[in-house]
Every structure is written in structure tokens, then in C-alpha cells.
Curated annotation (Swiss-Prot):
S-S pairs: none
Family in the record: Belongs to the MESH1 family.
E.C. number(s) listed in UniProt: 3.1.7.2
Known function: ppGpp hydrolyzing enzyme involved in starvation response.
DNA-binding recorded as keyword: no
Protein's organism: Mus musculus
Superkingdom of origin: Eukaryota
Lineage of origin: Eukaryota, Metazoa, Chordata, Craniata, Vertebrata
Protein name stated in the entry: Guanosine-3',5'-bis(diphosphate) 3'-pyrophosphohydrolase MESH1
Regions annotated as coiled coil: none
Named cofactor requirement(s): Mn(2+)
Length: 179
């Protein structure tokens, strides 16, 4: 597909197209694409990640879970390695929400190194977003519950990337949580 820059832009363009009708749950209703771009940016700028497969997976991490995208489609455009990472970080939306959350906690320690990086950056982005503003319809109690659940997931991802883990640890400590 050409240079790594071209591959990254292809993934960003694909994700932007797939998420084009979606908005974040913040009061401003920011475009959803800001989230996967932000996750990829955390990986490059804060964790020092340059692995193109991991960065493409970060950009695509919610396409299968939250749009009509299939894993076969991801593989067709981006290859088997990207597909595997996206598959690892995709929740099964046919399951009830509590079961999906339980599975994330249970499966975190068994994830591949690349999937662990995407999960850490995803949690970091979401937790920073929650600190920035409460999503529409969320109580402060629900925000705290999300932090508590995220801390359980992150516990299973420890030993992956010191920079991301330190940033997350600080956010948890501000909420009275420890890993």
C-alpha cells in the first residue's frame, strides 16, 4: 500500500468515513472520529509507538464494534495483523453491557502486546474525556463507576507501557483508586 504515512492516512480516512454520522457523548457532541485519532496520537506522542499495525488498529479500533464494518472488511483493506488487533479490542455487542465489561476485565491480561497498547490508550483517552466533561445523561456516580471498572481493566494490562500506565495511575489516584 505504499509508505507507512500512506497506510496511516488510509486507516484514518476509512475510520472517518465509517464514523461520519457518529458523535461523542459529550455536551458538545464532538465528531466521533476525534476519539480514534486521539487514541492513535496518545500512542505516538506519549507512548513512543511507531508500529504501523498498532497505529492502524488504534484508528480502526471502534469500526467493527460501533459501525457496520466487518472484520473481513478490515482485513481486506489493512491485512490480517490489523484485523487480529481490531478483533481483540472489539466487544461483542450481542452480549449484555455488564457481560461485555466483565469480559474486558477477564481478557485484558491475555491480550497481545499490540492490543494491550490500544486498550491502554483507549482507556486513557476516555478517562481524560470524562475528567474534561460529564457525558450527556451521566451522573457523577456513573463517571466514578466507569473509573472503577477501567482500573480493573488496566490492572490486567500492566507491564505493557510505563508512560501510559503512569498517566493512568495518576488519573486513578485523583479519584481515590489504586491499581
Amino acid at each position: 500500500m505504499g509508505s507507512e504515512a500512506a497506510q496511516l492516512l488510509e486507516a484514518a480516512d476509512f475510520a472517518a468515513h465509517k464514523h461520519r454520522q457518529q458523535r461523542r457523548k459529550d455536551p458538545e457532541g464532538t465528531p466521533y472520529i476525534n476519539h480514534p485519532i486521539g487514541v492513535a496520537r496518545i500512542l505516538t506522542h506519549e507512548a513512543g509507538i511507531t508500529d504501523i499495525v498498532v497505529l492502524q488498529a488504534a484508528l480502526l479500533h471502534d469500526t467493527v464494534e460501533d459501525t457496520d464494518t466487518t472484520l473481513d472488511e478490515v482485513e481486506l483493506h489493512f491485512g490480517a495483523q490489523v484485523r487480529r488487533l481490531v478483533e481483540e479490542v472489539t466487544d461483542d455487542k450481542t452480549l449484555p453491557k455488564l457481560e461485555r465489561k466483565r469480559q474486558q476485565v477477564e481478557q485484558a491480561p491475555h491480550s497481545s502486546p499490540g492490543a494491550k497498547l490500544v486498550k491502554l490508550a483507549d482507556k486513557l483517552y476516555n478517562l481524560r474525556d470524562l475528567n474534561r466533561c460529564t457525558p450527556t445523561g451521566w451522573s457523577e456516580h456513573r463517571v466514578q463507576e466507569y473509573f472503577e471498572w477501567a482500573a480493573q481493566v488496566v490492572k490486567g494490562l500492566q507491564g505493557t507501557n510505563q508512560q501510559l500506565e503512569e498517566a493512568l495511575k495518576q488519573l486513578f489516584e485523583e479519584r481515590g483508586l489504586t491499581l
